[in-house]
Amino acid sequence: VESPLIAERISNAEIVITNKTPISRTTIDKCPNIRLIAVLATGYNVVDYNYAAEKGIPVVNVPTYGTASVSQFSIALLLEICHHIGHHDKTVHEGKWAENADWCYWDYPLIELEGKTMGIIGFGRIGQAEGRIAKALGMNVIAYDLYPNESGRVIADYVTLDELFANSDVISLHCNLTPENTEMINRNNIAKMKDGVILLNNARGQLVNEADLADALASRKVAAAGLDVVSTEPIKADNPLLSVPNCIITPHISWAPKESRSRIMD
């Protein structure tokens, strides 16, 4: 339920600056003086931008501030999935290595990325930045985007969405949330993916049907997921993804290094 305080506090404003506070059709109608809405983020789905456009109100965002931090974080999630660094560090500090009969041990299968295929859905600035890192790791990169461009072709081969699902060892989401792609990661599309695929989501939680993903993680159709976003934030205690062990969830921090936060204000 939308708080009435939103419209109350911006009722006389001409310029509205927001981040996570929603600006809905109802709020826009209650605030006739608004001339500009600025979203201090890359994603702007907190604003009913279609209705704002109907009313002649520009909606602007900050599309470049988090390119480096979000792409870096996405790869960090992937490397944690591949090597379980946090777990092994914890067991060493708990004494397992000191007590081990062999000179080393690993508690999970470890994964080498070279030669594997990363499929990136949403190949704008962040997707392309992640693609460059993936290529530096020796991965093959394919991408799906509604608007392919030449800078992307230097990094990846553009493919259809079904081709990406079928051929990717790792799938990474970096697309805007729209009515058309809401819950695009669902039971039907997961069935098109390779067995043992890894899923990364640093875009919007609503891109994923969380119950379907939890089922796929439990069956190991999806080997692991690294998520910095979920459908409702903060996460609800009954989110089904909390019950599956092969799912890393972080509290929407990929954007948050000091350097990127400074760029928002610049």
Q: What label would you give each PLM region?
A:
Residues V1-V60, A166, N186:
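An N-terminal-biased, well-structured beta-alpha scaffold segment characteristic
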Residues N19, L40, L77, H174-L177, ...:
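Short, well-ordered coil/turn residues at beta-beta hairpins
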Residues S24-I28, N140-I142, L146-P240:
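Rossmann-like adenosine-cofactor binding region
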Residues P63-T117:
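Phosphate-binding beta-alpha-beta segment of Rossmann-like dinucleotide-binding domains, i.e.
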Residues I253-D266:
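A conserved FAD-binding loop/helix module that cradles the flavin
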